[in-house]
């Protein structure tokens, strides 16, 4: 069996939420205070009776609760579903809780925390109306009222099967579940230092003589093994008695016991020293140490990360022990569950990756842990998980807590799912944690976007720029290839038919990439001034049109932004189109010599523009003089012909020529150019009046994402 579903009603930040789980590993991610720990605590309340009412307070009720006409209740139901080839004991445990077959069995356990029917219940209903003003209850006063007069009278129950029947779950069967929760504030050192600790002692005791017994029951061992085990025990007893007698002779007991005679205590019997040592007694003396290059150091001097790993290993060993009927008989656990909060604590990225892989393999190889729950903020843990195992808690557009299942968001689109699984690395998986997402189509855009955002004020009064607000609103910028935007957008394609997707605000900033169809039938990129009214030309690339039709139109949380149709091309092209005469766009990535594209040559073209911005022929002439090879001249003739016949104004033609030349200079060095350009723009931002002009589509994208 496995926990396939949980419904949480009126518990902490969950007013009424349902979550689905996978059979093995479940990695629960989300922003701070999303409810990751609350979800684990809810499971614990159902399966761990020690954590029921004794740990609950009035603050565990959901504060969104508003209808106080009847006493508020906490209800948590988990669904246990049948697994293929599961152990026979599973069905025995849940038999009385089965609610149906579909086609495999489903069983249900429900934790309920409530005020029982009776005088107290009636008293509450009579008094609560005094806290009602204008048809609404005064929530804060009501919660204080409940805490003072009624909370101590609440009871906790766990029901099995159909909740309407209110049949209490058998306590003995509930004990078959072993729920181990390692919370974020775990003191690993304290838990495992000495052998007198419960976990360490139990593990040591179980593995005593394990090389002989192999964990089998005594009655199942061959006679020769039993004899060997008995000899070991007898030898230990003889040796321990010799050790004790040696110690006893060194103690002047008469000096100690004479006071007993003087006080008269000896009349009740003469005190003496005696002992019988067994293995269990000496286990108390054992302690964990770390040996490195022959040196022994105490566990307290070991790193926190490694101590956490050691502690987890001990817990896993303990869970193995408690599920062994050879050791515990009928008290053995049937369904061990391990929940770990923030396993990344004190672990470097490589260890995080390895740790989750180990835990998952422990389940997949049919280890003793049957189901694993992990809560994390780590993108490294997330990237190590299978996409189907990830559960994403987030705030929807309306501010409500929602749950997304990235592995289920793709529907039948296996190509997109496989692509995202392959490329959802530690960097890209940040999109699952952020409140809002900007997808850009290259590292240059990712590097430059924060700087471009700094040119606009979000809150002028408090001097907060859009760059500041991107951080304040937890917006992440992720670089993906333009033609693979659609794969990642499937994760966020949320509507009533696909609630597995994640309803976050997503903005895509992409290139227009105009294209023309060659005689060979292939589409190739072109400049806006080369476009003609023909089916052989597209002002927007086909993949950009698809993004707008397939994602922007049907999904309210997805928006696509690109350069102006018929005038724009790429971000670099737009920089010069909006700043044709500015030297800010010139960087050290330009060729230094032996090229028509040196800094000096481009400045000369800008001078022609600044002298007369309609003199496109002058710009063409100046550029033509710098060309030295036949190939350069051949390409230029094509450009010159197209610019002459296009319908742009003379000024727009001048800008188009400069934009085309600029694009050809930087297109093969986008990353390096972006690095230098960002440096130039940061200096410009320090000026009292920055001169650089941000492309309109970038402004619009930032306005959309920031609201």
PLM regions: where:
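RecA-like P-loop NTPase motor core
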Residues: 364-366, 382-510
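Switch/communication elements of ASCE P-loop NTPase nucleotide-binding domains
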Residues: 1-48, 281-427, 663-707
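Switch/connector loops and helix/strand junctions flanking conserved nucleotide-binding motifs
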Residues: 85-90, 119-124, 189-193, 381-385, ...
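Flexible phosphate/Mg2+-sensing switch loops adjacent to catalytic phosphate-binding sites
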Residues: 48-72, 320-333, 365-369, 373, ...
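Activity-critical C-terminal alpha-helical subdomain
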Residues: 505-656
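Glycine-rich phosphate-binding loops of NTPases
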Residues: 53-68, 84-220, 412, 524-553
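Nucleic acid-processing catalytic cores of prokaryotic defense/repair systems
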Residues: 1-106, 113-116
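Extended helical coiled-coil dimerization/tether regions that scaffold
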Residues: 176, 188-340, 517
């Amino acid at each position: 069996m496995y926990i396939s579903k949980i419904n949480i009603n009126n518990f902490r930040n969950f007013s009424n939420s349902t979550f689905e789980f996978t059979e093995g590993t479940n990695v629960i991610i989300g922003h701070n205070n999303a409810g990751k720990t609350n979800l684990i605590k809810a499971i614990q309340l159902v399966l761990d009776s020690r954590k029921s009412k004794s740990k609950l307070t009035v603050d565990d009720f959901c504060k969104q609760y508003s209808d106080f006409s009847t006493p508020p209740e906490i209800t948590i139901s988990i669904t246990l579903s049948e697994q293929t080839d599961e152990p026979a004991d599973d069905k025995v445990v849940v038999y009385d809780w089965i609610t149906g077959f579909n086609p495999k069995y489903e069983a249900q356990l429900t934790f309920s925390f409530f005020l029982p029917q009776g005088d107290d219940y009636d008293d509450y209903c009579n008094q609560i109306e005094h806290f009602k003003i204008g048809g609404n209850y005064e929530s804060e006063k009501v919660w204080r009222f409940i805490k003072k007069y009624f909370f101590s009278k609440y009871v906790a129950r766990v029901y099995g099967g159909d909740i309407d029947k209110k049949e209490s779950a058998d306590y003995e069967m509930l004990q078959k579940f072993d729920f181990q929760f390692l919370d974020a504030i775990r003191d690993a050192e304290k838990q495992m230092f000495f052998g007198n600790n419960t976990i360490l002692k139990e593990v040591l005791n179980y593995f005593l003589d394990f090389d002989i017994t192999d964990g089998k029951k005594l009655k199942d061992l061959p006679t020769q093994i039993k004899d060997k085990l008995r000899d070991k025990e007898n030898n230990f007893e003889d040796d321990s008695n010799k050790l004790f007698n040696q110690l006893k002779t060194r103690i002047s007991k008469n000096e100690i016991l004479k006071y007993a005679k003087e006080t008269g205590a000896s009349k009740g019997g003469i005190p003496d020293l005696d002992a019988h040592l067994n293995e269990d007694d000496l286990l108390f003396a054992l302690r964990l140490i770390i040996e490195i290059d022959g040196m022994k150091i105490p566990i307290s001097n070991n790193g926190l990360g490694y101590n956490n790993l050691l502690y987890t290993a001990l817990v896993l060993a303990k869970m193995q022990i408690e599920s062994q009927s050879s050791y515990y008989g009928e008290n053995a656990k049937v369904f061990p569950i391990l929940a770990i909060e923030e396993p990344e604590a004190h672990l470097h990225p490589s260890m995080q990756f390895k740790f989750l892989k180990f835990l998952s393999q422990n389940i997949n190889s049919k280890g003793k842990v049957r189901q694993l729950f992990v809560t994390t903020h780590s993108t490294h843990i997330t990237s190590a998980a299978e996409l189907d195992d990830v559960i994403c808690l987030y705030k929807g557009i309306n501010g409500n807590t929602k749950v997304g299942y990235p592995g289920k968001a793709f529907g039948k689109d296996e190509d997109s799912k496989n692509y995202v699984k392959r490329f959802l690395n530690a960097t890209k998986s940040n999109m699952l944690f952020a409140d809002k997402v900007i997808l850009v189509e290259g590292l240059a855009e990712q590097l430059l976007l924060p700087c471009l955002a700094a040119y606009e004020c979000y809150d002028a009064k408090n001097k907060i720029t859009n760059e500041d607000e991107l951080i304040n609103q937890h917006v992440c910028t992720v670089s993906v290839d333009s033609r693979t935007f659609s794969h990642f957008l499937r994760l966020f394609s949320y509507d009533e038919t696909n609630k597995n997707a994640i309803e976050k605000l997503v903005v895509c900033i992409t290139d227009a990439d105009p294209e023309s169809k060659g005689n060979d039938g292939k589409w190739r990129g072109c400049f806006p001034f080369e476009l003609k009214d023909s089916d052989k030309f597209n002002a927007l690339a086909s993949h950009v049109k698809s993004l707008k039709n397939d994602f922007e139109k049907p999904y309210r949380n997805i928006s696509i932004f690109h350069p102006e149709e018929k005038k724009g091309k790429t971000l670099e092209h737009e920089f010069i189109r909006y700043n044709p005469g500015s030297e800010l766009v010139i960087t050290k990535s330009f060729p230094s010599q032996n090229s028509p594209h040196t800094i000096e040559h481009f400045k000369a073209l800008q001078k022609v523009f600044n002298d007369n911005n309609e003199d496109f022929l002058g710009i063409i002439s100046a550029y033509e003089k710098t060309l030295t090879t036949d190939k350069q001249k051949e390409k230029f003739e094509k450009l010159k012909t197209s610019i002459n016949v296009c319908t742009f104004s003379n000024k727009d033609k001048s800008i188009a020529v400069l934009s085309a030349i600029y694009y050809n200079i930087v297109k093969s060095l986008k990353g390096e150019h972006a690095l230098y350009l960002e440096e130039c723009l940061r200096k410009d931002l320090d000026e009292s009046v920055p001169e650089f002009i941000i492309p309109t589509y970038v402004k619009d994208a930032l306005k959309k994402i920031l609201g």
